[in-house]
Amino acid sequence: MKRITKENYENIVYISHEFQNNPENVIEIETIIKKLQKEYPTYLFISPVHTFGYLYDDVSYEQGLNMTLFLLDTCCDEMWYVPSETSRGVSAEITYCQKFDIPCKPIEM
């Protein structure tokens, strides 16, 4: 078995989507990533909702946001987001990308 590193993927993309502890949002994220994975088979898509969503009621909002921003900053090449006028998290992630020159763009579905 060989070691798997970032070089194994053409791009590592953080998927930003509103969560608000809503199971329907989880299903929508899964649908989006499945479609994107077929369109971009050499990319790795990372969902912070699937990584940290189970902690929604166990950590503060700020702590949860910091965890997701750390994941974004350390693991991913860029962020793609589903535009949302109601999600503080998506807005914070976009602001973070702009401040630290992390490429980000809306997902066009």
Predicted segments, located by residue:
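Conserved catalytic or regulatory cores that recognize and/or transform ribose-phosphate-containing ligands
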Residues: 1-109
